[in-house]
């Protein structure tokens, strides 16, 4: 059941999906946040992740989603989590959410037999908002309609309506976030990122961190460092941890990130120099033969590219430059 299988592009998506695509993390959080009667009816032990994303492609930098199925009585229902990490309120969010729900139903119909008695599964929509401020919107689709005064009763049969569960991290104190250790630490960290509070004690709760899987701990540290925090404060915070194993892991991840950053910098520098060499040749001699252009663009040795840039500026002909390339 899927609209697309696009890769994760955003750090918020990566951390959110790494944690909450695991049914045990999603179930432990959702059963505490959806209405009590619904939570009691859902068989959370059989919560199953469905593949795909239903979000508009141009909005995937601001939102991500997960779809689950689970039994309620003798029927399956769907639980849809829309994670909004945009920093502004969207008054028409319910309309966009409805669009995603329609896509889910259409996909469901494609994947299931459509006999005369076919009926759509109920979707329990949940919106998780990361914004640092509380939103003023009402989580009720019917509230979007401009119904003429005095006509509410007459028009009620024609006004579609559904509600969604709105969970706002801005309104949840750190200690009120419930779930598994991994789920709690992911949401605490995401909440703190919006308020520039990533060194707060709840984000470094050792009693929970020691229970978090290693791959999630690594993503948490990468997420924190990716927020461009003060590196000296990070080092001080890590050194204050009592668990030596956590200290070691955090600093190892930080070292890996620095090494990756240097490698990316070298790669980007090589690509820029290669483009500069080709541009210099084009300015001086016009069209650059494709084989020569391809050869230059695959080079990543910065020293060699710098030499070739000087050669490109000084050489008398493309043929002379080609000989220079051959000579290294």
Residue ranges and their predicted role:
Residues 1-328:
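Elongated, amphipathic alpha-helical interaction scaffolds
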């Amino acid at each position: 059941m899927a609209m697309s299988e696009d890769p994760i592009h955003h750090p918020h998506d990566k951390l959110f999906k790494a944690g909450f695509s695991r049914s045990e993390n999603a179930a432990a959080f959702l059963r505490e946040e959806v209405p009590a009667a619904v939570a009691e009816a859902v068989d959370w032990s059989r919560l199953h992740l469905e593949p795909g994303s239903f979000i508009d492609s141009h909005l995937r930098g601001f939102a991500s989603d997960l779809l689950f199925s689970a039994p309620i009585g003798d029927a399956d229902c769907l639980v849809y989590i829309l994670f909004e990490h945009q920093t502004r309120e969207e008054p028409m969010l319910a309309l966009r959410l409805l669009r995603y729900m329609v896509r889910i139903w259409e996909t469901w119909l494609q994947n299931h037999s459509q006999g005369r008695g076919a009926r759509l599964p109920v979707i329990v929509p949940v919106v998780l908002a990361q914004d640092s401020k509380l939103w003023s919107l009402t989580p009720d689709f019917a509230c979007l309609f401009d119904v003429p005064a005095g006509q509410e009763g007459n028009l009620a049969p024609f006004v579609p309506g559904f509600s969604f569960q709105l969970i706002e991290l801005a309104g949840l104190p750190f200690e009120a976030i419930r779930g598994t250790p991994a789920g709690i630490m992911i949401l605490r960290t995401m909440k703190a990122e919006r308020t520039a509070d990533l060194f707060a004690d709840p984000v470094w709760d050792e009693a929970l961190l020691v229970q978090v899987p290693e791959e999630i701990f690594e993503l948490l540290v990468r997420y924190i460092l990716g927020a461009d925090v003060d590196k000296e404060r990070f080092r001080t915070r890590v050194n204050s941890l009592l668990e030596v194993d956590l200290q070691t892991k955090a600093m190892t991840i930080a070292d890996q990130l620095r090494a990756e950053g240097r490698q990316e910098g070298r790669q980007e520098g090589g690509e820029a120099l290669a483009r500069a060499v080709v541009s210099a040749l084009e300015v001086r001699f016009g069209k650059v033969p494709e084989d020569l252009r391809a050869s230059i663009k695959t080079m990543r040795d910065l020293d060699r590219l710098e030499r070739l840039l000087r050669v490109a500026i000084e050489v008398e002909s493309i043929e002379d430059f080609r000989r220079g390339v051959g000579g290294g």
